[in-house]
A protein has these predicted regions:
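Long, domain-scale functional regions
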Residues: 11-73, 77-448
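Short, Lys/Arg-enriched N-terminal segments with co-localized hydrophobic residues
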Residues: 1-6
Length: 448
């Protein structure tokens, strides 16, 4: 007989029912194919069948082989529960001859960590990306640490893992699956852009919604990502006509003093309103080198106020499309961006009253009327109006926002009372070393 051994661990009575709990330890397996296309191993009065992704196999996967148990089906009233630590099965109510089938499936992982509670994730966006969902999923991660050898609330910031995204195009043109994270707390309130008519890409008094030369982009990113044709003279950023646009580009990225996005008119000099990022900006090169430079999609939206054009799935398509205001860029290469409207929409878990499917069938424009959708979304904050990266394609200056009321609307890019939550992709070489992702025990990263 093949080597499956039952180690008796407990026998006890509850009422008149005998509860027999046994642990099956798999040392080696020699299965026999049955007529019902199952693989069965008999040991005494117990039988066990093994399936990987719905197909029977001749062995059970090892603990570190990248599989998790999908379900266990036992007959004759027995109940099987999988012990992930011991990598074995606990069987209850084994009062007679039983057969248990154990179904394994490929584990979902983020940063090398197997997601054991799959109720906290979803994979149903158009590209089957793995996303965390819910009001408070275990997706906290320490990042931007002053000391990665001693990661805690004092040495690190808390960020949230949005998810793992498939086939992200990197700056060198290659594609990888990369993990996107967002700062848990707002960096502060800033204008998205406040360039006036004739300055850079602006053609209005309300700023420009072209991210490639927005003042917010310049505040967050290093000079490596300055728009082609633009120059820097004595720390002043100038457009292709040598008009001043901004000053001290990259202050957040470099953890230095810089300037807030501010009004600048054609023919005038930029007047810096100082902002100090020495404590809230990126702290060191370990952090900076952990961020992947990628292609960010800048597609915009036209109509989005109904269920035929404003669902999270529609936004996902708009963001990756080429519909933008005339002359504006459809993509941008850089490190620090913002969340998308679709990130917000897909992060909901819904509730027992209004489940996720129903939330995703409702336009984000009207989510303010569905508390079960936005209250069960960790990207929502009732105290913040949050900038996104996505623009209006019919306007040269409107940007989409996640409002404190829970819906997604557009507003002028020059407004200064909207919150910024830096968002970025981690390099694929980075993994989780410890932690459980809760707010009290965030994941800790191993930076290579």
């Amino acid at each position: 007989m093949g080597g499956v051994f039952l180690l008796l661990s407990k026998i006890s009575f509850y009422g008149t029912t005998l509860i027999l709990i046994v642990l099956i330890l798999v040392l080696s397996l020699k299965f026999n194919k049955k007529t019902e296309n199952k693989i069965i191993e008999e040991v005494s009065n117990e039988y066990m069948a093994s399936y990987f992704d719905g197909e029977y196999q001749t062995e059970i996967p090892g603990k570190n082989d990248g599989y998790v148990v999908d379900k266990i089906v036992c007959d004759n009233g027995a109940v099987g529960e999988w012990d992930n630590e011991e990598w074995g099965i606990n069987i209850r109510n084994a009062t007679q001859k039983i057969k248990c089938s154990v179904y394994f499936k490929k584990a979902l992982t983020i940063l090398g960590k197997v997601i054991e509670d799959e109720s906290q994730i979803a994979t149903n966006d158009p590209d089957n990306n793995i996303r965390y969902v819910g009001a408070e999923p275990n997706n906290y991660v320490y990042f931007n640490c002053s000391n990665y050898s001693n990661q805690n609330d004092s040495t690190c910031e808390k960020w949230r893992i949005i998810g793992e995204f498939n086939n992200i195009t990197k700056a060198d043109g290659t594609k990888e699956n990369l993990t996107k994270i967002i700062r848990n707390d707002s960096l502060g309130n800033f204008s998205w852009d406040y360039k006036q008519n004739g300055v850079g890409t602006s053609i209005s008094t309300y700023g420009s919604n072209d991210w490639t030369d927005s003042q917010l982009m310049m505040m967050l990113n290093t000079t490596d990502y300055l728009k082609s044709g633009y120059t820097i003279e004595n720390s002043v950023v100038k457009d292709s006509n040598s008009q001043a646009i901004y000053q001290n580009m990259g202050s957040y990225y470099n953890g230095a003093s810089g300037c807030k996005p501010a009004s600048i008119t054609s023919g005038s000099s930029f007047s810096c309103t100082s902002i100090d990022f020495t404590s809230t900006g990126l702290q060191n090169d370990l952090t900076r080198n952990a961020i992947e430079s990628v292609v960010w999609n800048l597609g915009g939206a036209n109509e989005y106020n109904s269920s035929v054009n404003g669902l999270a799935s529609h936004w996902y398509g708009y963001e990756r499309g080429i519909t933008i205001y005339s002359g504006h860029a459809t993509t941008w290469i850089g490190k620090i961006g913002l969340m998308y409207p679709s990130d917000y929409g897909y992060a909901t878990s819904g509730s027992s009253m209004q489940n996720r499917t129903l939330c995703l069938s409702k336009e984000l424009y009207n989510w303010n009327s569905i508390a079960d959708c936005y209250n069960n979304d960790y990207l929502y904050n009732s105290n913040l109006n949050q900038w996104t990266l996505t623009s209006s394609s019919t306007s040269a200056y409107n940007i989409m926002n996640v409002y404190a009321l829970g819906n997604v609307l557009s507003t002028f890019s020059y407004y200064s009372n909207y919150s910024v939550r830096p968002t970025l992709y981690l390099k694929s070489s980075i993994s989780i070393s410890k932690g459980d992702g809760s707010s009290s025990n965030p994941y800790q990263l191993k930076l290579n």
